[in-house]
Amino acid sequence: MPKDTSIKSVLIIGSGPIIIGQACEFDYSGSQAARSLREEGIEVTLLNSNPATIMTDPVVADNVYLAPINIDSIVKILNERQIDAVLPTMGGQTALNLCMEAYELGIWEKFNVKVLGADFKAIETTENREAFRKFMLELGIQVAPSYVANSFLEGKEAAQKIGFPLVIRPSYTLGGTGGGFVHNKDEFDEKLQRGLAASPTHEVLVEKAVLGWKEYELEVMRDMNDNFVVICTVENFDPMGIHTGDSITVAPAMTLSDTTYQKMRDYAKLMITRIGTFAGGCNVQFAVDPVTEDIISVEMNPRVSRSSALASKATGYPIAKIAAKLAIGYTLDELKNQVTKTTSAFFEPALDYVIVKIPRWNFDKFAGSDETLGLQMKAVGEVMGIGRSFQEALQKACQSLENNRIGLGADGKQWVSADDMLQGVGNASWDRIFRLYDAMKLGVPLKTLQEVTRIDPWYLNQIMELVDTEKKLRKLSLKQIDANLMREVKEKGYSDLQIAYLTNTTEDEVYEYRTKELNIRRVYKLVDTCAAEFEAKTPYYYSTFDTTNESPVSDKKKIIVLGSGPNRIGQGIEFDYCCVHGVLAIKEAGYEAIMMNCNPETVSTDPDIADKLYFEPVFWEHLRELIEHEKPEGVIVQLGGQTALKLAENLHNMGVKIIGTSYDSMDIAEDRERFSDLLKELNIPYPDYGAAKNAEEAIEVAKKVGYPVLVRPSYVLGGQRMRIVINDEELTQGVVKILKFFPDNNILIDHFLDRAEEAEVDAIYDGEQVEIMGIMEHIEPAGIHSGDSNAVLPPYNLSENVITQMREYTEKIARALDIRGLINIQFAIKNEKVYVIEANPRASRTTPFICKAYNIPYLNYATKIMLGVNKLKDFTYYKRLLGYAIKEPVFSFDKFPGVSRELGPEMKSTGESIRFINDLYDPYFRDLYKKKSMMLSK
């Protein structure tokens, strides 16, 4: 069936600010859907309140509404635009819930708007736990025994009938919000109350717990003719009991028998074809008894999800893009495979590689939180490793996490207490994979580990093989590792750093020996959807150790852009936005743009964005070999946050050109002592400070600069481990904590300017001229991290004298550091005197906010200035902002009950939204201003 020609304009509802359970995967799906619809000549209007998204860019949509995701905004858009249809399946639970609300209020009917890709009956059936249970039983598909409860009394009655352990699952929530396991009566009351409160309909399902069963997900597509394909089968490494967003997952499924797979496939087809009339993507989850192979249905999501983004990157099949086409009437057999461009989209991808996804947590930001994993998602991001084997993919994923590990094992950071280790293994701690490895090294039998964790023995044996390899290497010197053993070790995913640790050598020595003497190098393979059966046209690669290379090197001039790795607090979607715009500008400037990143949720890892995508850990060894393969003109590190910036020193030492600001200038800005010397030279005020290596030295510095002081480690992002302290005892505690996480770190102690105001500037310098992109004044006082502050653009209360000082200092610093491209400077203002707190010679988390508020493509300009192809005078700067824009932080405290919500110098927000106000009389602004100091803590 060809497309529905009556649809000429579509509204896509976004997912809003990043929260735990709903992250950048919806920016990826929304951007893909918008591009897909525009290819068909359809006008796309977008509603989203998140300024850090690519989907809210003029390059993606025809009309963008950066506004709260609520009914008022929907009505405003429908009054202002001729909208024929709405696509609510690209914005997660937020978009789906809003679409349902508008439907119940009769808004879609009133404005004659067709709902695409979703069926309200299907949404109601899948989101309402009781309706889903009945639907499954009608189809003859088993579910866990359960009862619905709409009150505390009904919940207690259900628990009595089912018995413990049991599960509480609230209706209409995302990321398992309010859900949890209950092992006994003592826990039940509190968890039931939380579940009822979390559900917007105050309804929960009380369900028998199937702890220890294996969990699988099928990512499927269906069109209007009931054509059906399974895009990807994902197996959870962790058994039932841990939210799939907190589970390590593997594709293709490694331990699934063909009989069980075929049965699951038949169930999924039956479910998706019988649930309603929608066309698009759907995620179906099953649990399988590891002994009997009995199958029960857990849940289904008739929309694009976190798993869809993972499945798209795992297979190369662009689910959101195809789902958008199906929503406007196309059928699968009418569409082309987007990778081969020759075969049909009506096919099931075949993988000749393995992917492993590992979540990324930020428990260190939520002191006192329960770190045990369960039904409620707690991860803030994720990474994906691609390899020829499970072991290689697992090691690459571990190398991508940026958690001070260099892979799984072989880094001297193992747990030594068997009790601590087994507790972490049994209670499903966030670092369970590392504790499992350590337990095996200590000789804990696999049978014991399997009984404690219920993880499939196949996976445990794979990890045991890695432990055995490590033991073998420990007995050898580097030169005793022959070519066969080296190849075997590298095929298992071990990094050169791990081999160096085991052989008591250096990473460089291992690299030289491996590549020069043994001639063992990485080759690059295509992610092609068809296991190399057809030629792929999409340049999407991963590295492995094999004989044939599938990544031809062109003779064009090339630039590599380093991505920002996994989402985490302090470094989120903002930096992915910067990377994508950098890549697009590089292409416009006539270079070949090469993207390197390991985050499956993001737009930067969409194979359609760069000329070449390397899905690799942003890890020195992988970058080094990629540079030797592609021989680029240089590498851009300014756009990928601290992840990319940390590799600047290695690039500098290797003699690779860093595009834009030089390594030495970056080091001056990052090194507090060098930066303070520069400020002194420029006659720019800064708070008194000192550096220390231990607690005794820190106390001496504090005496000199005066309490209160801000104590912090060097070279971190998001205010990691920063504290405001008021006496020697607190200072000692702060220093000990920093040294525990950052051994040998240079600790900085600054005099804290109490009751100062805070402001920041983002600017571009081209070697001649400075362009101030924006001056933002924080509503909250100094002491609350800039990422957790409400920032107002332009300033609302700073005097002309203060603004002049800030402009003057920005220009002085940019010239002195000889910046090429972007710089962010943070200021404290006290008694009309301006102090410089820090300078960041890179894109900042406020860069996208300014671009959106003023509607100026500053990142495009900055990238072209870094490349040296343009000067600031070549561009126009018309700031289209009436009134003020406020950058509002958004928190995910509800995922961590009982955790203090106080704010301080360490960042805790997971996302942000933008709000436009006409003037300072706006009631929303006045309310924010009244509360500005309430949350300040140490």
Task: List the model feature ranges, each with a label.
Residues I19-A67, E80-E127, Q142-N150, R568-F575, ...:
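A short, GP-enriched loop/loop-strand-helix hinge that lies immediately N-terminal to
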Residues K110-G179, T661-M722:
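A conserved helix-loop-beta module that forms one wall/lid of the active-site cleft
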Residues Q498-E550:
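C-terminal amphipathic alpha-helical interaction region
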Residues L116, E157, H183, W213, ...:
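Catalytic core of soluble alpha/beta enzymes
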Residues P2, K8, D27, Q32, ...:
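ATP-dependent carboxylate activation and anion-phosphoryl transfer catalytic cores
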